[in-house]
Amino acid sequence: MTAEELKKRTLQFGVDVALFCKIIYPDPLLKAYANQLIRASSSVGANYRAACRAKSAKDFINKLKIVEEECDECMFFLELIKELKPDSGKSVEPIWKEANEILSIIVESLSTARRNEQSKKS
């Protein structure tokens, strides 16, 4: 997957989460979680874009670590919403799956970037 494709994918992830949260937002119990989920999901795309513009390998790795954390946070809030509102399961599953796939890509990218950084030092 190219950087441009992943930029589009993380943007779409943010859109999908926002549309999902629009549906669950009227539930007073879930409002705070929906707001946090929107912030975290938009941060995934924003920080990935920032990583693509990193000024150094160290900067790139640090920004990708933020993406990793935010993506994991999205998964946590999706799981929490699913537990609190079990009927949201069908809506949560594809978004959670996408978050997990993005997280896997980011974790692998981090591993590669760290290996490349180590090989430069050797």
Where are these regions (language model features)?
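Short, C-terminally biased terminal segments at protein or domain edges
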Residues: 1-122
